[in-house]
């Protein structure tokens, strides 16, 4: 069965009092969201949910960093629930879906694969 990652990254950085949303802050010289996407690079499809106001900024970051991991961008909603719903609406096939927070890049591929294997049982 196809594996799809739905990565939700709709934050604006308000609680951190940062002008830059935390998904775009640098971690080891790379934007945090890029680290998260890379962890799911072995999935057949990656959907990233962002506020529409951040689409152009994300596109520019991808060009600046030469980031070419294949992923689809979907507009987020006013709540996390709505953002996940918007992402799920782009899936039209039976699949195993991993929903992940884009600002949690420290998850290991081993843990991801373990969780996916548990869904198959």
Question: What positions do the PLM features span?
Answer:
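Short, glycine/charged-enriched secondary-structure capping and boundary segments
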Residues: 20-23, 61-64, 88-89, 111-114
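Active-site-proximal flexible loops/turns
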Residues: 15, 58, 107-108
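Short glycine/serine/threonine-biased micro-segments
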Residues: 8-11, 27, 74-75, 81, ...
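Conserved N-terminal catalytic core of the sugar/cofactor nucleotidyltransferase
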Residues: 33-94
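Conserved short-loop catalytic and cofactor-binding motifs
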Residues: 21, 46, 75, 99-103
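N-terminal glycine-rich phosphate-binding loop and ensuing alpha1 helix
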Residues: 2-55
